[in-house]
Amino acid sequence: VPLTFAGTVDRTALHRAALALAPLVGAPEVAAAWDRESALPGMTVGGVARHLVGQFEAAVEFLGILPPPSHAPVVTLVELYRRTDWFTAPVDAPENTSIRDDFDAMAAGGQADSVAVLARSTAWLPDAVAAAGPTTYVPWQDCSVSTDDFLVVRAMEVLVHADDLAASVQLPLPDLDDELTHPALALLAVLSARQHGTPTALRALARAERATGPAAAFGPVAG
């Protein structure tokens, strides 16, 4: 059975995450480090912050594409990532560096712009979720997924990039609801298995003494 969260998601969890992350995005430590390199090599702290708030911005935008285009197939989460060019590309490949460079450029508006994007998206998100249909169109991959699966993808991205931002300025990751983190972690486990194979992912998660190397869902894939 393909991984899906359809019918199981707390659809208010993403909104609560937006509220919980506002202090981090607006933190003076983030402002002071805005143009410095982040915990992600080659990407500025500002770029990471802009990428983080962009997850909420994209949620509002994509949930509002109603109805989804008729030509777009409805796919599973695994198929969504199979269609994603950056997923298996090396971190220094254009598929990944273009994302880094785009968000570094978008961060030129400074911290105040990212704070405003987050505030605006936070205000609009509840209505966007309430009005969403059963599936949501993802223009980047020209396909649709169940709306609950779409929200889990955004939750996972939020969790990962919130940690990136916090680590970049030596702040703790803000507490986020289990309703957001548990589905996000489940998705990351499956994506790790897709990247590295089930045995590698399994051992990294369950048996450190048999772990054969890194099993991150994103990043370099062992040769």
Placement of each model-derived feature along the sequence:
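Structured surface interface patches that mediate subunit assembly and partner/cofactor docking
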Residues: P2-P23, P28-P41, E61-D92, S98, ...
